[in-house]
Amino acid sequence: DVRRVPVTRTPFLTRQQAQWREPLPVRVAVCASVMKINPNFLATLAEIERRSRVAVRFCFYMGFAQGLTLDYLRNAIHAVLPGAEVNAHMPVQAYQSALNSCELFVSPFPYGNMNGVVDAVRQGLPGVCLSGPEVHSHIDGGLFRRLRLPEALIATGYEAYIRATLRLVEEHDWREMLQHQLQDSDVEQVLFEGHPEKFADVISDVWQQHLPFDAASERVGTSQRLSS
């Protein structure tokens, strides 16, 4: 069964009022495979948690995290973020339902995180990403722009990443406006439409540029064989 779990999300402040005994944390999803969790990323999340004016909980949904790998990963994350929720690899519908319990997501860096971004925005979650100098760090920002998410959510440094996440965590109205924007748009159509023929055109141009060099190289090789 590959049907998507529908998004059902009550406004945060409404849920917060119902839970009066203790502050309701803003749940922040981290969707990524195991290899993308690294010390710089965890330290940045810890700084966000330290600075936040509201309770926040990072919820890790880790692809391929099972058995001893999950135990090791949970220990490593809890060493930096003691209150984090660390989940094992789960079936897709359970994963989507879990994302529905969150308010936003953060993309790990410095690697691109296309699958995690797609999973989160399909469930109506806005997020924050870090665009760096490497080619592999640009894809998240490209997806954000395609979805018309605010440029402020595409950070270019650690401090900007922290500030953008704090704003999304603390400003409930802004965050929920972005949630509705994503839910009201055809996210899958936006993400997967494109012009694949442009890639073929570029490859064709490169090939055409190399043809004269290949021909010249062939002539030189033929001449050398004849002279020998």
Language model: regions and residue ranges:
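Conserved catalytic-core segment of nucleotide-activated headgroup transferases in glycan assembly
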Residues: 1-92, 205
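C-terminal amphipathic helix plus adjacent low-complexity
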Residues: 32-34, 54, 60, 71-75, ...
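Hydrophobic (often cysteine-bearing) scaffold residues that line and stabilize catalytic clefts
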Residues: 41, 69, 98, 136, ...
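Short acidic active-site motifs
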Residues: 93-95, 115-116
